Amino acid sequence: AAKIKKGDNVVVLTG
């Protein structure tokens, strides 16, 4: 996961 998506188990903050 590169962005915060609904239903995503892994949340990776990239900026």
From Swiss-Prot:
Keyword Protease assigned: no
General function of this protein: One of two assembly initiator proteins, it binds directly to the 5'-end of the 23S rRNA, where it nucleates assembly of the 50S subunit. One of the proteins that surrounds the polypeptide exit tunnel on the outside of the subunit.
Subunit structure: Part of the 50S ribosomal subunit.
A single MF term (Gene Ontology): rRNA binding
Protein family: Belongs to the universal ribosomal protein uL24 family.
Alphabetized UniProt keyword annotations: Ribonucleoprotein, Ribosomal protein, RNA-binding, rRNA-binding
Record keyword tRNA-binding present: no
Protein name: Large ribosomal subunit protein uL24
Organism: Brevundimonas diminuta
CC per GO annotation: ribonucleoprotein complex; ribosome
